Amino acid sequence: FHDIKILFTKKGTKIFKNLEVLKEKKFFKKIGISIYDTNCLNYINLNYNFDAVQCPYNILDKRIITTGWYDKLKNQGIETHVRSIFLQGLLVNKLLYKKNYFKKWKKLFINWFQSLENDNISPIDYCLSDLMNYDFDKIIIGINNSENLKEIINFKTVNKNKMINFNISDTKLIDPRSWK
């Protein structure tokens, strides 16, 4: 389910039950949901037996971890698939944060890119190294060009001592749906 709002309706319940029947008949192996924040998981987890959750995770947005849902899902045998590793490119492209919408966080991004430069660390290496702290089942990565792909394939793990603990709760920054 890409738009989970339907799961809060009678129609959604009916659709889910039909999907469970098809799953039992081996038409597919897993039923998954895609979320933007963890607030919906209490209701959905109580009312539906899904197999996978696709959610955002990056150095700024660790809500799946900080809310305890990562551990809960793991303990229930539910797969965690993470996306938005580079926050729609914002964490790896210096030009993006200069857009007017991100003015409020300009200092954060200047410090981010400057600290990486000072330590001779690529943003892609840093973001991917941060993922290594968890046992995510799948990682969905977007790229803009072949150089990005090469860097991802050849990424070098960043020393944990050089990792900064960001935890941003401002959804106007970490939820791309709010970007204008």
Segments predicted by a language model, with ranges:
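Beta/alpha (TIM)-barrel catalytic core signal, keyed to glycine-rich beta->alpha loops juxtaposed to Asp/Glu
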Residues: 2-180
